[in-house]
């Protein structure tokens, strides 16, 4: 392994965004939407060089004429043809590398089905001909990037939220909990409450505008009831937002009502427990001896943990649930949007990791199932 030319590639395929780059870098080189768009209408502009599909930002910018699909739902790949297009785009258009020259580290959701891990492995070796491959659980990588090997990770992205307890670098499967409530649901919820104000966002393209409103203006209230009361008496929290067509809309208590669903999934009609209760439940599923270390190392990761106020609220709620003498610490690193990717970059750069890769030779001898023996 000499220098830059054989740097490993780290690809973190999220439900909403794909983060890709080179091991050893401190941030991903490419971050683009995990979406594939296909034209809604037959091409009428002859000679326009219309493609039959577009990926990422290009799909996003042409969204008015395309049908957009996200091949990763709730963190799990559900459409392999589209997924292959995203990987192809990552290698050739975003990173501009030949995949057959670089080891590739992919990330996966906790509890990813076995057949999915095998399929990922197979596509990497057979379609892209990579020389070496590894797959890592996203939450474990987030913990590494925070400089810990023990802790409990609340990883909330666009498609799924997981709570994953980790001890000495190994995830504790009996304590892993998943909530099918994440950024995309909050965006939909915000659309719904904005429509009560008379603003309508219906198409997949308009949904992206709502996502932008959410990312710029939403926050988590420390005390929801109190905040509702305050906002009804004053307009201090009102903000205006200019739509692409120049229309300006005003958004008030929607700013904190949308993300409140993370703590009260019932707002979305879901029976799940909130992120606070789920984190507590996960800790309680773990051995008594490790709980103290978990309470003291609650690490937030993923774009949906980026709301201002979320760490303080979490601290308050978990402290109320935990035994009274327990020291509760929430770690919310500023780079947590990319902490899964950063953890992958760190892991693949370790000298001790180099013998962990699945080589092409091993794959040719054992087939896709080797992933279960070498990646855990």
Swiss-Prot record:
Q: Which reaction does it catalyse?
A: ATP + H2O = ADP + phosphate + H(+)
Please provide an example of a Pfam family that matches this protein in its UniProt record: Actin
Q: What is its EC number?
A: 3.6.4.-
Looking at its record, which EC class is this enzyme?
hydrolase
| Main location per the UniProt record | cytoplasm
The GO molecular function terms of this record are: ATP binding; hydrolase activity
Quote the InterPro entries the UniProt record gives.
Actin, Actin/actin-like_CS, Actin_CS, ATPase_NBD
* An annotated GO cellular component: cytoskeleton
Record key words, sorted: ATP-binding, Cytoplasm, Cytoskeleton, Hydrolase, Nucleotide-binding
Q: Where in the cell is it found?
A: Cytoplasm, Cytoskeleton
PANTHER family per the UniProt record, alphabetical: ACTIN (PTHR11937)
Its biological function?
A: Actins are highly conserved proteins that are involved in various types of cell motility and are ubiquitously expressed in all eukaryotic cells.
Family per record: Belongs to the actin family.
Q: What is this protein called?
A: Actin
């Amino acid at each position: 392994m000499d220098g830059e030319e054989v740097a490993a590639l780290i690809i973190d395929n999220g439900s909403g965004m794909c983060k890709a780059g080179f091991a050893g870098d401190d941030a991903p080189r490419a971050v683009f939407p995990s979406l594939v768009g296909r034209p809604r209408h037959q091409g009428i502009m002859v000679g326009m060089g219309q493609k039959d599909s577009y990926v990422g930002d290009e799909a996003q910018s042409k969204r008015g004429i395309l049908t957009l699909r996200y091949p990763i739902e709730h963190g799990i790949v559900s459409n392999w043809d589209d997924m292959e297009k995203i990987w192809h785009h990552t290698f050739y258009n975003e990173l501009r590398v030949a995949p057959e020259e670089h080891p590739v580290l992919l990330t996966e959701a906790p509890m990813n089905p076995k057949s999915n891990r095998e399929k990922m492995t197979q596509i990497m070796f057979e379609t892209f001909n990579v020389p070496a491959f590894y797959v890592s659980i996203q939450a474990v990588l987030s913990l590494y990037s925070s400089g810990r090997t023990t802790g409990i990770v609340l990883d909330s992205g666009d498609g799924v939220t997981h709570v994953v307890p980790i001890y000495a670098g190994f995830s504790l499967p009996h304590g892993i909990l998943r909530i099918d409530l994440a950024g995309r649901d909050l965006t939909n919820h915000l659309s719904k409450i904005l429509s009560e104000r008379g603003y309508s966002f219906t198409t997949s393209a308009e949904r992206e505008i709502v996502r932008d409103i959410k990312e710029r203006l939403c926050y988590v209230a420390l005390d929801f009831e109190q905040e509702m009361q305050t906002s009804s008496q004053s307009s201090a929290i009102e903000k205006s937002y200019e739509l692409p067509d120049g229309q300006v809309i005003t958004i008030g208590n929607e700013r904190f009502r949308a993300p409140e669903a993370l703590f009260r999934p019932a707002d979305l009609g879901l029976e799940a427990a909130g992120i606070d209760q789920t984190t507590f439940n996960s800790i309680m599923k773990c051995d008594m001896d490790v709980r103290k270390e978990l309470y003291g190392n609650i690490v937030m990761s993923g774009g949906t943990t980026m709301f201002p106020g979320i760490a303080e609220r979490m601290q308050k709620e978990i402290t109320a649930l935990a035994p009274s003498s327990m020291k509760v610490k929430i770690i919310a690193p500023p780079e947590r949007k990319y902490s899964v990717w950063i953890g992958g970059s760190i892991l693949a750069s370790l000298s001790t990791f180099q013998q962990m890769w699945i080589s092409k030779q091993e794959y040719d001898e054992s087939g896709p199932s080797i992933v279960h023996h070498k990646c855990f």
